[in-house]
Amino acid sequence: MARSIKKGPFVDTHLQAKVQAEGPSSKKVIKTWSRRSTITPDFIGLTFAVHNGRKFIPVFVTENMVGHKMGEFAPTRTFFGHAADKKSKLKKK
């Protein structure tokens, strides 16, 4: 179920304070563990280092990202592909 419009988007207060302190066109990377925060128009043009559980992934915010969550752009799992079928390889030889 989607979040109610009357509540507005969720942004951690400490993250919002960091964004307002930096200014609109800052080159400094803002480190955050807040994957749950929604990207607002204030974040456009800023670079965030979003934690994925192991390391910080740099995320440059563009207009298309507004309304999405920070965590969507820092994947937590690495997909190595499906295991190959060993039986079919043995029959071919």
UniProtKB/Swiss-Prot annotation:
GO annotation terms (biological process) = ribosomal small subunit assembly; translation
SUPFAM superfamilies in alphabetical order: Ribosomal protein S19
GO MF terms listed in the record are: rRNA binding; structural constituent of ribosome
Q: Which UniProt keywords apply?
A: Ribonucleoprotein, Ribosomal protein, RNA-binding, rRNA-binding
Q: Does the keyword Zinc apply?
A: no
Tell me which domain of life the UniProt entry assigns to the organism this sequence originates from: Bacteria
Gene Ontology cellular-component annotations: cytoplasm; small ribosomal subunit
Residues spanning the membrane: none
Under the heading InterPro entries, the entry gives:
Ribosomal_uS19 (IPR002222), Ribosomal_uS19_bac-type (IPR005732), Ribosomal_uS19_SF (IPR023575)
UniProt-listed Pfam families = Ribosomal_S19
Described purpose of this protein according to its UniProt entry:
Protein S19 forms a complex with S13 that binds strongly to the 16S ribosomal RNA.
Give the UniProt family note.
Belongs to the universal ribosomal protein uS19 family.
- Give the protein's recorded name: Small ribosomal subunit protein uS19
Q: Which organism is it from?
A: Geotalea uraniireducens (strain Rf4)
Q: What is the lineage of its organism?
A: Bacteria, Pseudomonadati, Thermodesulfobacteriota, Desulfuromonadia, Geobacterales
